[in-house]
A protein has these predicted regions:
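Sec-dependent N-terminal signal peptides
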Residues: 4-13
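Subset of outer-membrane beta-barrel
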Residues: 21-188
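Sec/Tat signal peptide C-region and signal peptidase I cleavage site
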Residues: 16-20
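Hydrophobic alpha-helical membrane context
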Residues: 14-15, 75
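Positively charged n-region of N-terminal signal peptides that target proteins for export
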Residues: 1-4, 169
Length: 188
């Protein structure tokens, strides 16, 4: 019971942090819901953003069928009841115009997930930032009499819950349900 309580508190802490973070400094985040974030894990990125793999030690958000299947087996003869994954990201951006240049550094929460295999079934849930907004733009008219300033911050997050079923040793099927939430603030 204590472990479940600690997991719920950690989940609440990460959710509150992810709702208030700003993980981009891109002027392109001015448009729409902002810059879209990659929806996978560091293993997906390291393999060229592949999303069809399945193994016994990694969680794959991009393929809900991977919540079951090989992840039910043990790795090095140790039983794994659940798979837990969390990721952080760091980026440095150089912004340059004909007049100015600046450097922006961002460190952010990338993902949190838990996968629970249950016989031929599997369940996964977690939290992934969906988009990020973070910009400060300034321009003026030709006479420099009027200055226009635009700024924005925030983003959308995605909470997901997925289920999978292993049809046979080579085929699994799965689906995710997702809920998007967050706040985007644009100031002109």
């Amino acid at each position: 019971m204590k472990k479940i309580f600690l997991i719920l508190i950690a989940n609440f802490f990460v959710c509150s942090l992810s709702n208030s973070q700003n993980s981009t400094s891109s002027p392109y985040s001015f448009y729409g819901i902002g810059s879209l974030n990659f929806k996978g894990t560091s293993e997906n990125r390291a393999m060229g953003r592949i999303s069809v793999y399945n193994d016994s030690i990694h969680m794959n958000f991009r393929n809900p069928a991977s919540y079951t299947g090989k992840n039910m087996f043990s790795f090095n003869n140790e039983g794994r009841l659940v798979k837990f994954t969390v990721g952080l990201g760091h980026s440095e951006t150089d912004l340059t115009t004909s007049d100015n240049s600046s450097k922006a550094t961002n460190t952010s929460f990338d993902y949190l997930g838990l996968n629970i295999p249950m016989g031929k079934f599997g369940m996964g849930f977690g939290l992934i930032p969906h988009s990020s907004v973070g910009y400060k733009l300034q321009s003026s008219n030709q006479d420099n009499l009027i200055q226009y300033k635009y700024s924005g911050n925030g983003g959308l997050n995605k909470a997901f819950l997925g289920f999978a079923f292993q049809v046979n040793n080579n085929i699994s099927i799965g689906f995710d349900t997702r809920y998007n939430f967050g706040n985007i603030e644009n100031i002109a």
